[in-house]
Amino acid sequence: MARIAGIDLPPNKRAVISLQYIYGIGNKSAQDIIAAAGIDPTTRTKDLTEEQARKIREIIEASYKVEGDLRREVTMNIKRLMDLGCYRGLRHRKGLPVRGQRTHTNARTRKGPKRGIVRAKPAAPAR
């Protein structure tokens, strides 16, 4: 089983598909990496030689920001926006959509579950 960027890649999938299990590598990036390594795109992960796995590892380390580094960078970018107090930062801080979507209806994913209106309990009858 190939282990790249701290992730165990699934052995029975094609190398292009299994590379996408790494956070920060999508379809196009995976295809570019396989092409740069000179590997046939139909090769299964279990059929990769140690040399091919090493070549993929080197390409990823040299050219891509993946896993923990990428997550940390994204988090720091959001934190920077919030510290600046700009509009996008305020939207992040309030947990609302950042990119201009409507919030009158929809936006439930960002806003969380609905909070119902609390009604007053009916008064108990006098005795």
From Swiss-Prot:
Family statement: Belongs to the universal ribosomal protein uS13 family.
Superkingdom, natural source: Bacteria
InterPro entries reported in the protein's UniProt record: Rbsml_uS13_C, Ribosomal_uS13, Ribosomal_uS13-like_H2TH, Ribosomal_uS13_bac-type, Ribosomal_uS13_CS
GO molecular function, one term: structural constituent of ribosome
Record GO biological process: translation
Keywords: Ribonucleoprotein, Ribosomal protein, RNA-binding, rRNA-binding, tRNA-binding
Gene3D superfamilies, per the entry: 1.10.8.50, 30s ribosomal protein s13, domain 2 (4.10.910.10)
Pfam short name (any one): Ribosomal_S13
Protein name (record): Small ribosomal subunit protein uS13
Basic residues compositional bias, start-end: 96-118
Assembly and interaction partners: Part of the 30S ribosomal subunit. Forms a loose heterodimer with protein S19. Forms two bridges to the 50S subunit in the 70S ribosome.
GO CC, alphabetical: cytosol; small ribosomal subunit
Region (Disordered): 96-127
